[in-house]
């Protein structure tokens, strides 16, 4: 990185913020939060802060169900992207990676960039970045190279997808990061697709574990595609629904789900069809 690069990037960030583009650009809005709300300097050179081993252990314990549910999906995602110089990170709701997958030969590089367990990747600490900005905006996104707030992070490309728990609350983020200069737009699109599918598998497994005593039934969205999962007890009461199921059924994501007859929620014939085939509809 040449000497003019830090000054150029910092000037570009400040110019975009000053121009008022934050109202039209989610990226500039994130830059503005980083600068004005969190008082960060895009030219800052301090490496990411890290938790102590004891603090990291506590963070892992707090999201133990998510960690357990994520293992298989993280393994499969890493098998798909690891050979291309990417690492896979699972971060908690505070933006702290609590688990990762990576090639041993790349460990030193990723550690030096802070793409490691225990690092603090919230927007408050690291400005615009995949994990932190995903947590704020609660949507899948990619922060590519100079879209990062800090100049020192502009060699990174990070794709992040939010993960919601069995109560439809934001639980963490699944992230695939790379510091390779040859990452193409086409490859980034494939990574985004693979990461999104892995996040869905984690959510489904987390939901099944939380409602292991219930039937887990697929719902249909308005487009005929899978709308999410609901948990139905022995009395045919819906006692749980994933975030996507709530959206498909018109249930506010922030509202506590009270037990409701499946027939009332799904509709008469639809409910009977779903419940009659409940065991067939269970996600394996």
Which role does the model predict for each range below?
Residues 1-125, 129-150, 155-157, 164-166, ...:
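Intrinsically disordered, low-complexity terminal regulatory regions
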Residues 103-106, 110, 245-257:
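PAS/PAS-like sensory domain cap-loop motif
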Residues 146, 257-258:
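Proline- and acidic/polar-enriched loop/turn elements at helix boundaries
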Residues 146-147, 155-160, 264-284:
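PAS-family sensory/regulatory modules and their coupling/dimerization elements
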């Amino acid at each position: 990185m040449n000497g003019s690069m830090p000054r150029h990037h910092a000037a570009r960030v400040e110019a975009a913020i000053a121009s008022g583009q934050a109202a039209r650009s989610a990226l500039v809005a994130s830059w503005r939060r980083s600068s004005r709300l969190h008082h960060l300097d895009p030219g800052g050179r301090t490496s990411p802060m890290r938790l102590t081993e004891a603090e990291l252990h506590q963070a892992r314990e707090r999201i133990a169900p998510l960690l357990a549910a994520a293992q298989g999906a993280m393994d499969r995602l890493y098998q798909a992207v690891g050979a291309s110089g990417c690492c896979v990170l699972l971060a908690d709701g505070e933006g702290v990676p609590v688990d990762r997958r990576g090639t041993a030969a790349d460990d030193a590089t990723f550690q030096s960039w802070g793409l490691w367990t225990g690092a603090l990747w919230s927007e408050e600490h690291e400005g615009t970045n995949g994990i932190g900005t995903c947590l704020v905006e609660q949507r899948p996104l990619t922060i590519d190279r100079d879209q990062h707030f800090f100049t020192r992070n502009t060699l990174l490309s990070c794709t992040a997808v939010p993960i919601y728990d069995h109560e439809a609350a934001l639980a963490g983020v699944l992230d695939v990061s790379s510091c390779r200069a040859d990452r193409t737009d086409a490859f980034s699109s494939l990574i985004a697709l693979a990461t999104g599918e892995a996040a869905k598998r984690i959510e489904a497994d987390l939901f099944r574990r939380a409602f292991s005593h219930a039937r887990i039934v697929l719902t249909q969205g308005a487009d005929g595609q899978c709308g999410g999962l609901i948990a139905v007890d022995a009395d045919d009461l819906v006692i749980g629904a994933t975030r996507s199921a709530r959206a498909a059924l018109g249930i506010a994501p922030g509202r506590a789900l009270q037990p409701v007859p499946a027939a009332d929620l799904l509709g008469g014939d639809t409910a009977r069809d779903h419940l009659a085939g409940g065991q067939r509809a269970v996600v394996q």
